[in-house]
Amino acid sequence: MKKILSVTSLLLTLVMLFALVSCNTVEKTGAWENATYLKDTELGKGEKTVEVEVVAEEQSVTFTIHTDKATLGEALLEHGLIAGEDGPFGLYVKTVNGILADYDVDGYYWGFYKNGEMMMVGVDSAAIADGEHYELKREK
């Protein structure tokens, strides 16, 4: 009898654990299908801390990045969060967090903002300071 009770309680515990884990799963769909991160994530070690919110298709994820790098582009490249091509005006960002926005391919681009205001420089030229908040938004 004790053995049956032990097995039953073990099975019930496993079922409850599986149910809790399943409820916390975020599905990769649409633009987020190839995303590296689906949940807010903290990365790096360094003196400065900046937040970078990535927005695409009504979904977003925020990266809290600790870094000693001088520019946002360097900090994002250090963690593999952005990729693109060097052009006449600096880095042309095409991929953020694994999400593609290539104007020549799909008509989308990455808008770059600081505290809700569009930046007049690219990520590779944006000097960073502790406590700043940036947004990279997939726009058409």
Question: Language-model segments: what does each one mean?
Answer:
Residues 2-12, 17-140:
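Ubiquitin-like/PB1-type beta-grasp interaction modules and other compact soluble beta-rich domains
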